[in-house]
């Protein structure tokens, strides 16, 4: 079983490349490496492409430029999902964090042990 991490990206935020490096670094550290990464890029610059090139020798990254409906997150997300070929498709937005080295392992185990074919994940921080 393989996970495809589908990441819609853009260059609307000055930190977009830094966030992508954070995701790539966390994926590189995963204990289970049965995954690939699909990047749909709504950028006008080459920052996202350059980040993908920096990790091309370490991660299985598929870069998909996307100039259609630029700025529409739904269209960009669909563009990342459409070509992905993993058994599990996991959307990660470019500002998302991976907080554990076992995310991929946990996703695969969760789908191995259940009849369900979809799931939603999220995180909420509450400041008191």
Each predicted region: which residue ranges?
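Short, acidic, metal-binding catalytic loop of nucleotide-sugar glycosyltransferases
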Residues: 22-34
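Short beta-strand/loop segment that forms part of the nucleotide-sugar
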Residues: 34-44, 64-66
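A conserved acidic beta->alpha catalytic loop
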Residues: 40-50, 93
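Glycine-rich, basic loop-to-helix element that forms the pyrophosphate-binding segment
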Residues: 67-84
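Short beta-strand-to-loop acidic/aromatic patch adjacent to the donor-nucleotide binding site
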Residues: 86-97
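Acidic donor-binding/catalytic loop of UDP-sugar-dependent glycosyltransferases
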Residues: 96-110
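A short, conserved acidic/glycine-rich loop-to-beta-strand motif
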Residues: 114-123
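Conserved small/polar residues in nucleotide/adenosyl-binding loops
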Residues: 126-128
């Amino acid at each position: 079983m393989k996970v495809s991490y589908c990441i819609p990206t853009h260059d609307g935020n000055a930190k977009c490349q830094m966030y992508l490096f954070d995701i790539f670094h966390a994926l590189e550290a995963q204990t289970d490496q049965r995954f690939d990464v699909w990047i749909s890029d709504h950028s006008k610059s080459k920052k996202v492409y350059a980040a993908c090139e920096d990790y091309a020798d370490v991660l299985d990254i598929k870069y998909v430029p996307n100039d259609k409906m630029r700025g529409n997150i739904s269209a960009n997300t669909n563009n990342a999902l459409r070509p992905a070929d993993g058994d599990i498709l996991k959307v990660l937005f470019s500002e998302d964090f991976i907080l554990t080295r076992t995310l991929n392992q946990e996703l695969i185990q969760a789908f191995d042990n259940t009849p369900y074919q979809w799931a939603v994940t999220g995180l909420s921080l509450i400041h008191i």
